[in-house]
Amino acid sequence: MRCVVTGAAGFVGSTLVDSLLALGHDVTGIDCFVDYYPRKAKELNLAAAKQNSRFTLIEDNLLTVDITKLLDSAEWIFHQAAQAGVRASWGGYFRSYSDNNVLVTQRLLEH
């Protein structure tokens, strides 16, 4: 199966990527590497997957990426992308949370 995993570099997303690859699926992962967690930690999450020829990583924002190109050939889409840390969502980072948690999900569902 051809799978797309959003939030592929996060803890949950990268674990799912590894599981799908272990089952023999082709996986395209997308992540925008927001700075909530250190980039190095997210890159380590994907270290094993990057060694697999059936894995492709796209570093882009789901709000601006060509969603048709990303999703049209996928048989399964696993949406794991989200801005973590709920407390900060009610402060100065509200826009980031609404964009990355609500608008991105809406865009995927409308496709």
Where are the regions a protein language model picked out?
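N-terminal Rossmann-like NAD(P)+-binding domain of SDR-like oxidoreductases, especially those catalyzing
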Residues: 1-111
